[in-house]
Amino acid sequence: HEIFVEESGNPEGQPILFLHGGPGGGTGAKQRRFFDPSYYRIILFDQRGCGKSKPLGGTLKNTTDNLVNDIELIRKELNINKWIIFGGSWGSTLALAYAIKHPKFVLGLVLRGIFLSRKHELEWFLKDVDIFFPELHNNLLNHIPNTSKKNLLEKYTELVFSNNKDQAYQAAIAWNKFEGSILKLLSPSTSIEANEVDNEFELARAKVQLHYINNNCFVDGEDILEKSKILKDKPITII
């Protein structure tokens, strides 16, 4: 894997690491807006298989432990003594996993839109979200014939990882549109038109996310909560 890392802001400022969501997301200019560039040394990176990292959509040797090790390697390569970790959604899971393993290098945490990859959270995402988004969930089910709540994950995994690129692209786009739409209580965005879609990026995003979900994100969310007690003296902001 080749990991894309970006620095901006004040080179002498307070180091802060942004961890993107997904799994399968990526970073971009908008993530820099969370931070005052005159104060912070801003570090963004695309996790394995994501964004500008290579190979795009790669799932081999792509686990939470691998990502935690990547974060620590980035810290060492950038000669950072201690930093603040900022993570949202899946990034909050990854932030805690890193902080638990390397607490002495963490000044504090900012966690937003918390998702801890616990079994009931994944079950809600796959099966119970139709309570709030019945139409979106039905659209996801109806995209592939003979799909139900019970086999939703299996069906989409099969298609997204299939050798039929056209079917894989369409399944990935449907999956990503659903996942992106349920992250907010606002009306679903209509900004993604067919001619704006990057098929390879959409496929990579879905591949990485399904790879993680099929493996419970390679973590025990309850264990993370229990082990996070060692961070009791760290300043943690939850949004």
List where the protein language model places each region.
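Short glycine-enriched nucleophile-adjacent loop
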Residues: S92-P103, L109
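Conserved HGGG/HGGXW glycine-rich cap/lid loop of the alpha/beta-hydrolase fold
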Residues: E2-P55
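Short beta-strand/loop motif that positions the catalytic acidic residue
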Residues: L231-K232, T237-I239
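Active-site nucleophile elbow and catalytic-triad environment of alpha/beta-hydrolase enzymes
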Residues: H211-S228
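Catalytic nucleophile-loop/oxyanion-hole region of alpha/beta-hydrolase
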Residues: P55-V68, H120-V129
